């Protein structure tokens, strides 16, 4: 047995007050619709246990995760809310779903029949959310098969269809607005098919973060919100859209481990991909690609030191990154370095990092590894 001591200065600071601020901003926009907080992938890297706890304390009733394992982590942490498992119920998981009061997203007839049989064997009724593919092309009953799916499900005596839902594929793209509205219309027709056979879902939902902002008609009585809760907006809403006042929840910081001056011709890092053309001041910081700083930022990304944008030079290593702090004023061992967050007048957001390497903000924060302690404030 040993006690873990986290003295390495690379940390992710999670601002739970910003999280609740964002929740309240979203509530003002979505009105009477309940909010389902999407906390899959460890709350997009922010820490699902604590984030879900704070959100439940603030009145959130619904949570969405990807897997049974993620759902059980929330239950073990004391979460008593409703939990939707978007990844469905895999064979052999039925008993755990029943025991822990979890709700599966169901998207094949094989799934729903298996859950019905397991519910019958346990003398109970299984509550499910039926997922339809209205244009995403991923998992879900095809929208044009709603009549036949409804006919099968109405005969299953141990299934309670609490919700019918779908997922927008391009709500963030103004050029695809007509298709987004078509998806919403398709969901209406799916619901009608179930009403025709006597199945009336108590909840219907299709709106994700961009859908809830840009398409008010899609809010229905439940919205699934992920990115906006964590303060992402720059790359999940169109550039021309007025952005809601959501704040980044994660700050990623470290400290300088060593400073040295290099001369013209000196190289930095593996492969000698950076060779100094003049005298430069180089700082090494204890964060690398294992911590979640993408290696593709090598010789491309920047960090903030003393409020000054300081470029990454050389290749990012597994545990270390080198930065040029020549223009950053006095820099010494222990000087704070901001990878995500504000320092003085400048701010680096996850979407800024993502944009420089052709990815999305979600991938940046989801990629921050467990080696980086989350500090909740």
Tell me what each language-model feature is.
Residues 2-20, 24, 28, 70, ...:
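Active-site anion/phosphate-binding pocket segments in diverse small-molecule metabolic enzymes
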Residues 4-6, 10-14, 18-21, 28-205, ...:
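Active-site-proximal beta-alpha core segment in soluble small-molecule metabolic enzymes
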């Amino acid at each position: 047995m040993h006690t873990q001591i986290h003295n390495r200065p690379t940390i992710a600071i999670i601002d739970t007050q910003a999280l609740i601020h964002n929740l309240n901003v979203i509530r003002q926009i979505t009105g009477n619709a309940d909010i389902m907080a999407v906390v899959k992938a460890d709350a997009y890297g922010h820490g699902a246990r604590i984030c879900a706890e704070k959100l439940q304390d603030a009145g959130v009733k619904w949570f969405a995760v990807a897997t049974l394992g993620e759902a059980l982590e929330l239950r073990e942490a004391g979460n008593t809310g409703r939990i939707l498992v978007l990844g469905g119920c895999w064979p052999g998981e039925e008993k755990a779903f029943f025991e822990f009061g979890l709700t599966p997203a169901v998207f094949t007839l094989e799934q729903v029949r298996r859950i019905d049989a397991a519910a019958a064997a346990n003398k109970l009724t299984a509550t499910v959310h039926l997922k339809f593919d209205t244009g995403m092309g991923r998992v879900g009953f095809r929208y044009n098969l709603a009549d036949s799916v409804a006919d099968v499900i109405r005969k299953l005596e141990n299934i309670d269809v609490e919700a019918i839902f779908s997922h927008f594929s391009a709500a963030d793209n103004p050029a695809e607005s007509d298709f987004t509205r078509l998806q919403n219309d398709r969901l209406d027709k799916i619901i009608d098919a179930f009403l025709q056979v006597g199945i009336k879902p108590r909840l219907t939902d299709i709106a994700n973060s961009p859908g809830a902002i840009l398409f008010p008609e899609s809010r229905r009585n439940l919205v699934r919100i992920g990115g906006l809760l964590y303060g992402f907006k720059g790359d999940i809403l169109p550039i021309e859209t007025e952005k809601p006042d959501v704040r980044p929840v994660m700050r990623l910081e470290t400290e300088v481990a060593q400073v040295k001056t290099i001369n013209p011709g000196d190289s930095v890092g593996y492969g000698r991909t950076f060779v100094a053309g003049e005298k430069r001041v180089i700082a090494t910081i204890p964060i690398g690609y294992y911590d979640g700083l993408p290696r593709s930022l090598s010789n491309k990304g920047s960090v903030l030191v003393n409020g000054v944008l300081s470029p990454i030079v050389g290749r990012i290593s597994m545990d270390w990154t080198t930065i040029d702090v020549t223009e950053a004023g006095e820099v010494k061992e222990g000087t704070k370095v901001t990878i995500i967050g504000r320092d003085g007048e400048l701010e680096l957001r996850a979407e800024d990092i993502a944009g420089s390497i052709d990815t999305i903000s979600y991938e940046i924060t989801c990629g921050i590894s467990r080696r980086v302690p989350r500090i909740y404030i």
